[in-house]
Amino acid sequence: MEPDPRHADIAEQRGDTRMLGTSIVIVDKPAWLLTTPSNRPEYNDNVLKRIKIRFPWAQGPITPHRLDMATSGVLALALNPQAHRHLSQQFAKREVHKTYIAILDGILSNRRGSVRLSLRGDFSNRPRQIVDSIHGKAAHTRYENLGIEGEKTRVAFRPITGRTHQ
């Protein structure tokens, strides 16, 4: 199967590679491209597939973290098992700091704050998450208002925990 032509091709265009080492590659993931394979045929293109085309010598697990399909951003990918283990440990120890920038409809009056909720998978509406104070896992996100543009607010979100779809 060929990579989806709607996206910049990570496998062929060097412009999407931000940094390349012997063990780790940093790439820009466009929105609407999966990080890893899906079992749905309409989503056969993904970053992992493209990386394996570009770096056929890469071994072992490659993706120590993911970005949601709708999210664009930077991915740190491992090209060998040792690098994967090292990156995974950094994510597990929360040594990696992530920031997501979003533009919200409406005006957010708070300059900064945090949100603490208990989240779990919504089994009837995967891959969505729901708030569940009994069975959910703690999720903590800090946010900062970066500015107002018309009727929209630019906000930086910094997840402290690493919950799916946090």
PLM region descriptions:
Residues 87, 163-166:
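Short beta-strand segments enriched for Tyr within beta-sheet-rich domains
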Residues 1-140, 144-150, 154:
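RNA pseudouridine synthases
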